[in-house]
Amino acid sequence: VLIDPDLPLRARDVVGLGLDGYRFGLRPTTAARRRRIDDMLEAVGASAFADARVGNLSGGEQQRVLIAHALIGEPELLLLDEPLANLDIASGHEIVELLRRIATEQHVAVLLSAHGMNPLLPVMGRVVYVAAGRAASGTVEEVVRSDVLGELYGHPVTVLRVEGRVLVVAGPHVEPEILAPSPTSPSEAERT
C-alpha cells in the first residue's frame, strides 16, 4: 500500500489512529499514549522515522508503520493483503522477518495473501494455495510441490529445493546447462 505523499500525517499519527481512531473526536495526548505509540514504533523498527510524513516514507517503511497501526490494538489475528507488494528484496525480507517475530514472540496469528510466495516460504506454517479457481491446503511440504502446483495451474511448475530454501518457478524442470569455458585470448606461448 503506497500512501499519498500529500497526506499530512506523521508515522506516529498513523499508529495513534490504530489506538483510538475508531472513536469520534479528538483524544488528548497523554504521556502514556505517547509511550505506547513509541513502544510500538520501536517494536516494528520504525522509531527512526516516527516524525516523518508517512507519505514520504519508502514502501518498506510505510509497511512497518501500517503493521504498527494494526498491532497497537493488540489483535489476535493480523490480516494482511499483499504485504510485500512494491518492496525491494531487502525490504521484503525485513517485513517477512518482522511478521515471523510477531507470530512467534507476540503470539499473533498472521494470515496474508501474496502473489509472490518465495520470500514467505521459510516462515509459513500452513498454506492455502489458490490458482485457476481451485485450492490446495496443508503444510508447505504438502502443498508447495511441483505435482500439486502443476495440477492447480494446469501448467508445468517446478519447485526447487536448494540448501534448505524453496523456489517456485513456472515451467518444467530443466537441467542447467554446463557452460563451456569462454574463449580466451591466446596464451603468451601461442603468440610467440
Label every PLM stretch briefly.
Residues 16, 30-49:
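Conserved ABC ATPase "signature" region
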Residues 53-57, 61:
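Conserved ABC ATPase signature
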Residues 74:
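Conserved catalytic motifs of ABC-family nucleotide-binding domains
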Residues 78-82:
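Catalytic Walker B motif of ABC-type/P-loop ATPase nucleotide-binding domains
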Residues 114-115:
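H-loop/switch region of ABC-family ATPase nucleotide-binding domains
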Residues 128, 132-142:
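Conserved switch/coupling elements of ABC/ABC-like ATPase nucleotide-binding domains
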Residues 146, 152-192:
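ABC ATPase nucleotide-binding domains
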